Amino acid sequence: MDFRVIGDTYRYGVRVSAIVEKDGKLLTYKVEDQNHLVGGAILVGEASREAVVREVKEELGVVCEVEELMFVVENRFDYKGELHHMIEFHYKVTLIGEVPSHTLDEGKYECEWIDLQRLSEYDIRPQYLIKELPLWKAGIKQIDIGIE
């Protein structure tokens, strides 16, 4: 069971994302005009490190090595009138294997490598990455994103 609750006007949960960098580029997948990180909800009883490995395997079909936790984010936002409140763990990971052209999950979204120097030219989700990713050097950075 996913570690999330979905109501009529709200959604909250705990999720993980894989930050995969290679040759100065960030791995994302495209949903319409947005670029997202590989990741998803943690399962109840699952450690976040285990969850990011599972999500990478499910979405890309490759094994990954978890290097370190980069960001812990409390992300609150309104999406189409629905309040979202997510606790997010974003891990730096290295992929062991080739990235497919599309994700393997039901959406089969196109995978896209984005130049780290051009992040601001994309609608990246989560959006804090545009500012914070180029500044990150080491260690865990806590980020609190409130509703605007």
Language-model region placement:
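A generic structural micro-feature
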Residues: 8-12, 81-87, 103-108
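Short connector loops at helix/strand junctions that flank enzyme active sites
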Residues: 13, 21, 37, 64, ...
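Charged phosphate-binding loop/patch that engages nucleotide di/tri-phosphates or the phosphate backbone
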Residues: 128-148
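Acidic, metal-coordinating catalytic segment for phosphate/diphosphate chemistry
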Residues: 1-17
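Active-site-adjacent beta-strand/loop module that shapes the phosphate/pyrophosphate-binding cleft
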Residues: 77-100, 112
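Conserved Nudix-box catalytic region and its N-terminal flanking loop in Nudix hydrolases
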Residues: 22-58
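NUDIX/MutT-family hydrolases
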Residues: 103-135
